[in-house]
C-alpha cells in the first residue's frame, strides 16, 4: 500500500485484514491458517494442507470445500459460509460434548476478531457495527450460527439492561442474532434457499451477548431469560453453545440440525407430537404404548433408554423405589410432591435409565429370554402397527433409520452415516431393509435386563413428567427435585434431558423463574471464573495478560492431547475416560507454558494431589522424572463441585452410586398443600399464579421433599399411606433415646426424665404442631392460605 502524504501505511482494521478475523502476524499469535498439520482428531479425520488466500486487503478468493477434517484456510470470517471451517464444524456428532483440537482451533480462528475486541463494552459495540452481517459458528450444535447484528437492528430488544439478570458482570453487550439452518423436509417453504445464508431461520428470538473476559450469553427475548453459555473463551471454543436447551426448541429444525430421538414407528411419533391434550395422550400411551422403550437422544451424551410408563405404580420396579422400606408409600409421597410443585394435573411419561441398559436382550432380570409373543402390547398391535422396539444399542451393527421430527413431521427417509449424521434422501430400499433388521419388541423393565446386567434392577435416573400445559419436567430421584426439561414434547425429543445436565445456568426474573420452575442459580458458575482457566490466572506470565498473547496461548499447537490419544489406543481404561485424561493433559501443558505450579493452583481451588506409586528412577531415561519435568505420575483431582454441577455430572455419566451431600435443613420449607389437581381442569393463568404464590411464601428457603436416595450415613425416610413423612427419617442425628436433661443444669443434681417419643398425627390440622422446628411464618401462611 502506498504512503499517503509521507505517512506510514495505515494497518487494516480489526477483523478486516488478511486472515480469519484479524491482522496477520500480530504478536506471537498464529494466523487463522496456521492450524497444526499433525493435529489429531478423535473423529478419525486426517489433516491436509491449508489453501492460501489471494493477497490483498479486503479481497479474498472463495476456496473450494475440502474433505472432512481439513484444516481451516485463511480468509475473512465473513467468508465462513463458503470456507472449509463450516464443513469441518458440521462434522461434530451429537453425542460428543467437546470439540477436538482441530475443531477447537477452527473456532478460535473464526472468532478471533471478536476475542481481540473484547476489551470494553464500547469496543464490542464498535466491532458489531463494523462486522455486521458476518456469520460465526456456535460450534455445538452444528447448523447454528451467530449473525453479527448491531443492537439498533435487533427487533424488540430496546433498552434492555442485561446486567439486571447478571449484576456481577461489569458489562454485557448484545452483538449477534442466533440463526440456524432449516431442513426443506421439515419446512417446504424454504425451497432453494436451504443451502444459502438467506434461508436461515431467525424466528427464535435468541440473541448472543458477550461480557468481560469473553463470557458468552444467550438472551431469550420472549422469556426474558439470560443463559450462560460459556464462562471464558477456552470453554466457548471447546464446547460451544451445545448446553443451551433453548436452542433446540424451533420446530423448523430438520433431521440433521441436530439429530433428535429416533422413533422408528410413525404411529408412536404421531402419538407424541400430535396429541392435543395431556389427557388424550395419557390414555393412548396406557392403551397402546405402555412399556415401550425409546432410545432417548440428549446432545452431549450417549443414547439412553426411556421406558414409557402405563401407570405411576410401575416405578416400584426401578431403583431407588424398589429398595425402599415401603415403595408404595414412597411413590405416594413423590406424587404428592409433584402435585405441590406443578400446581396442576400431570402425566408420567417414562423412566430414563442409564445407557448400559440400552440394547440388552429381552428377558427378565435373571437374564433368561422370554418369547416376544408373551407381550400383550405386541399382540394388540399385531395388525401391523406394533410399538417400536429399542432403537438399537450404541455400537451395534444393526442400522436403525432415524425418522423426521418436529412440527411438520416430514416423510424423508434417512439413514445415519459414519459420523452419526442424518443423510436426507437416502435409498428407500436400504432404509426398509434396516428397519426390518430392528430388534424385537421390549416391554417393561424386565425387557431391559440382559447378560451385562443380570441379577440387577434398573435405576431410574429421571422420571419424565408432562404437565397439562404441555411443558416437560423431570423428577430426579437422586436429589428429589423437579427440573424443567422442555417447553413441549417436540422440544423434548430434540433436547432430551439436557435441562437436567446444565443446572443453574439460566437467570430470569422471579416471576418467570417461578412460572417455569427454574432451579436456583449456580453462583460458582455465575460469579467466579473456572479454576482451570489458567490464561486468566493472576499469577500467569505477563505476555498472557493481553488479548494477542492469550489468543496465541489458546490456539498454540499441541496441548498434550496427542500423547493421550496415542495411549488411549493401547489402554482400555484411558479409552473409557479419554475426555478426563485429555483435560488433565491440557491443564498440565497450560500450567507449564504459563509458569504456574499446577499443584498450588489445585490446592488453592480446594482440590488435592493424588500421588501414584511408581518405581524408583534408575538410569538416564528416568532423569526427567527425578527433575519433575513430567507430572504424569501425579494426577490432580478437581476441586469439589457445587451440588448442581455434581448432580449434572452424575446424570451425564450415569453415576448410579451418586448420593446427595446432605438432607434438607431444619429451616426447610414444608408445603402443606394437599390439593389434588385433576388433569385437564386448570387454566394456564391459574397454574402460574399458584406457582408464584408458593414462591413468595417460600421466601427462598430450601424445599422439604421426599428423598428416595438418602445421603451416606442417613436412615431412609418413612411415610404413611397418604404420603406424609414420619418424623425421624433421613436424619444424620443419632436416635432419640427418650432421656432428656437441661444442658444448663448438672446431671448430678437433676435425674434424667423420660419423655415419650413423638407420635405422628394423621390429622392435617394437628400435624402443624407436631414439630416446632418446621413451623415458620411461611408455613403458617401457607397452611391458612390452603385450609381457610
From Swiss-Prot:
Record family assignment: Belongs to the herpesviridae US22 family.
Compositionally biased intervals (Basic and acidic residues): 651-660
Span list, region Disordered: 1-82, 610-663
Gene: TRS1
UniProt entry keywords in alphabetical sequence: Host cytoplasm, Host nucleus, Host-virus interaction, Inhibition of host autophagy by virus, Inhibition of host innate immune response by virus, Inhibition of host interferon signaling pathway by virus, Inhibition of host PKR by virus, Interferon antiviral system evasion, RNA-binding, Viral immunoevasion, Virion
GO terms, biological process: symbiont-mediated suppression of host autophagy; symbiont-mediated suppression of host innate immune response; symbiont-mediated suppression of host PKR/eIFalpha signaling; symbiont-mediated suppression of host type I interferon-mediated signaling pathway
Organismal lineage: Viruses, Duplodnaviria, Heunggongvirae, Peploviricota, Herviviricetes
InterPro entries referenced in this protein's UniProt entry, alphabetically: US22-like
Name recorded for this polypeptide: Protein TRS1
Highest taxon, organism lineage: Viruses
RNA-binding keyword on record: yes
Subunit structure: Interacts with host EIF2AK2/PKR; this interaction retains EIF2AK2 to the host nucleus and prevents its activation. Interaction (via N-terminus) with host BECN1; this interaction inhibits host autophagy. Interacts with the viral DNA polymerase accessory subunit UL44. Interacts with host HSPA5.
Primary role: Inhibits the establishment of the antiviral state in the infected cell. Prevents the phosphorylation of the host eukaryotic translation initiation factor eIF-2alpha/EIF2S1 and thus the shutoff of viral and cellular protein synthesis by directly interacting with EIF2AK2/PKR. Prevents stress granule formation in response to eIF-2alpha/EIF2S1 phosphorylation, thereby rescuing viral replication and protein synthesis. Also inhibits host autophagy by interacting with host Beclin-1/BECN1.
Ranges of biased composition (kind: Gly residues): 16-25
Signal sequence, renumbered to the chain: none
Localization, UniProt: Virion; Host cytoplasm; Host nucleus
Start and end residues of each stretch annotated as Interaction with host EIF2AK2/PKR: 672-788
GO cellular component, one term: host cell cytoplasm
Domains: entry comment: The N-terminus binds RNA. The C-terminus is required to bind and antagonize host EIF2AK2/PKR.
Record field: compositional bias (Low complexity): 26-56
Organism the protein comes from: Human cytomegalovirus (strain Merlin)
GO molecular function per UniProt: protein serine/threonine kinase inhibitor activity; RNA binding
Segments of this protein annotated with the region RNA-binding: 74-248
Pfam family, one: US22
Amino acid at each position: 500500500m502506498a504512503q499517503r502524504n509521507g505517512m506510514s501505511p495505515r494497518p487494516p482494521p480489526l477483523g478486516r485484514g488478511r486472515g480469519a478475523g484479524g491482522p496477520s502476524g500480530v504478536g506471537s499469535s498464529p494466523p487463522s491458517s496456521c492450524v497444526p498439520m499433525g493435529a489429531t482428531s478423535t473423529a478419525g479425520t486426517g489433516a491436509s494442507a491449508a489453501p492460501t488466500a489471494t493477497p490483498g486487503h479486503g479481497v479474498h478468493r472463495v476456496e473450494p470445500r475440502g474433505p472432512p477434517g481439513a484444516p481451516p484456510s485463511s480468509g475473512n470470517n465473513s467468508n465462513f459460509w463458503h470456507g472449509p471451517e463450516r464443513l469441518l464444524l458440521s462434522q461434530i456428532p451429537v453425542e460428543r460434548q467437546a470439540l477436538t483440537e482441530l475443531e477447537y482451533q477452527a473456532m478460535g480462528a473464526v472468532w478471533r476478531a471478536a476475542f481481540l475486541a473484547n476489551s470494553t463494552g464500547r469496543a464490542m459495540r464498535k466491532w458489531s457495527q463494523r462486522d455486521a452481517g458476518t456469520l460465526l459458528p456456535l460450534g455445538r450444535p452444528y447448523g447454528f450460527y451467530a449473525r453479527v447484528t448491531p443492537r439498533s437492528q435487533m427487533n424488540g430488544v430496546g433498552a434492555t439492561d442485561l446486567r439486571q439478570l447478571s449484576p456481577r458482570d461489569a458489562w454485557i453487550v448484545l452483538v449477534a442474532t442466533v440463526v440456524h439452518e432449516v431442513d426443506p423436509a421439515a419446512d417446504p417453504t424454504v425451497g432453494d434457499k436451504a443451502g444459502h445464508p438467506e434461508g436461515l431461520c431467525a424466528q427464535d428470538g435468541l440473541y448472543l451477548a458477550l461480557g468481560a473476559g469473553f463470557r458468552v450469553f444467550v438472551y431469550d427475548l420472549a422469556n426474558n431469560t439470560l443463559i450462560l453459555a460459556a464462562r471464558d473463551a477456552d470453554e466457548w471454543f471447546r464446547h460451544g453453545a451445545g448446553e443451551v436447551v433453548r436452542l433446540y426448541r424451533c420446530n423448523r429444525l430438520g433431521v440433521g440440525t441436530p439429530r433428535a430421538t429416533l422413533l422408528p414407528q410413525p404411529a408412536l411419533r404421531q402419538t407424541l407430537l400430535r396429541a392435543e391434550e395431556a389427557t388424550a395422550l395419557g390414555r393412548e400411551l396406557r392403551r397402546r404404548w405402555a412399556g415401550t422403550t425409546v432410545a432417548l437422544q440428549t446432545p452431549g451424551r450417549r443414547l439412553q433408554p426411556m421406558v414409557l410408563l402405563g401407570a405411576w405404580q410401575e416405578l416400584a420396579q426401578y431403583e431407588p423405589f424398589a429398595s425402599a422400606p415401603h415403595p408404595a408409600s414412597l411413590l405416594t409421597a413423590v406424587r404428592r410432591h409433584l402435585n405441590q410443585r406443578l400446581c396442576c394435573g400431570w402425566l408420567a411419561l417414562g423412566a430414563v435409565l442409564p445407557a448400559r441398559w440400552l440394547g440388552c436382550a429381552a428377558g427378565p432380570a435373571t437374564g433368561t429370554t422370554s418369547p416376544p409373543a408373551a407381550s400383550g402390547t405386541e399382540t394388540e398391535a399385531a395388525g401391523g402397527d406394533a410399538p417400536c422396539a429399542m432403537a438399537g444399542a450404541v455400537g451395534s451393527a444393526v442400522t436403525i433409520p432415524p425418522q423426521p421430527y418436529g412440527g411438520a413431521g416430514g416423510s424423508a427417509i434417512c439413514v445415519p452415516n459414519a459420523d452419526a449424521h442424518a443423510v436426507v434422501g437416502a435409498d428407500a430400499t436400504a432404509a426398509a431393509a434396516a428397519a426390518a433388521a430392528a430388534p424385537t419388541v421390549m416391554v417393561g423393565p424386565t425387557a431391559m435386563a440382559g447378560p451385562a446386567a443380570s441379577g440387577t434392577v434398573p435405576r431410574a435416573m429421571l422420571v419424565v413428567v408432562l404437565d397439562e400445559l404441555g411443558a416437560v419436567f423431570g423428577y430426579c430421584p437422586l436429589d428429589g427435585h423437579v427440573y424443567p426439561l422442555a417447553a413441549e414434547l417436540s422440544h423434548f425429543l430434540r433436547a432430551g434431558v439436557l435441562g437436567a445436565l446444565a443446572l443453574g445456568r439460566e437467570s430470569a426474573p422471579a416471576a418467570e423463574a417461578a412460572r417455569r420452575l427454574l432451579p436456583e442459580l449456580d453462583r460458582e458458575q455465575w460469579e467466579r471464573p473456572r479454576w482451570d482457566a489458567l490464561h486468566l490466572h493472576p499469577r500467569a506470565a505477563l505476555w498472557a495478560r493481553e488479548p494477542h498473547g492469550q489468543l496465541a496461548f489458546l490456539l498454540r499447537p499441541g496441548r498434550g492431547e496427542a500423547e493421550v490419544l496415542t495411549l488411549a489406543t493401547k489402554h482400555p481404561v484411558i479409552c473409557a475416560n479419554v475426555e478426563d485424561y485429555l483435560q488433565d493433559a491440557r491443564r498440565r501443558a497450560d500450567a507449564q507454558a504459563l509458569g504456574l505450579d499446577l499443584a498450588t493452583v489445585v490446592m488453592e481451588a480446594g482440590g488435592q494431589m493424588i500421588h501414584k506409586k511408581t518405581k524408583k528412577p534408575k538410569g538416564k531415561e528416568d532423569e526427567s522424572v527425578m527433575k519433575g519435568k513430567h507430572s504424569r505420575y501425579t494426577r490432580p483431582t478437581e476441586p469439589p463441585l457445587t451440588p448442581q454441577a455434581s448432580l449434572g455430572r452424575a446424570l451425564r455419566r450415569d453415576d448410579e452410586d451418586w448420593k446427595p451431600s446432605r438432607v434438607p435443613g431444619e429451616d426447610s420449607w414444608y408445603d402443606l398443600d394437599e390439593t389434588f389437581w385433576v388433569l385437564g381442569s386448570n387454566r394456564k393463568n391459574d397454574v402460574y399464579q399458584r406457582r408464584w404464590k408458593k414462591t413468595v411464601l417460600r421466601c427462598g428457603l430450601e424445599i422439604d421433599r421426599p428423598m428416595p436416595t438418602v445421603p451416606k450415613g442417613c436412615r431412609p425416610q418413612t411415610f404413611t399411606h397418604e404420603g406424609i413423612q414420619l418424623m425421624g427419617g433421613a436424619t444424620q442425628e443419632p436416635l432419640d433415646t427418650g432421656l432428656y436433661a437441661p444442658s444448663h443444669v448438672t446431671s448430678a443434681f437433676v435425674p434424667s426424665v423420660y419423655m415419650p417419643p413423638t407420635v405422628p398425627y394423621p390429622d392435617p390440622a394437628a400435624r402443624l404442631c407436631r414439630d416446632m422446628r418446621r413451623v415458620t411464618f411461611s408455613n403458617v401462611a401457607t397452611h391458612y392460605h390452603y385450609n381457610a
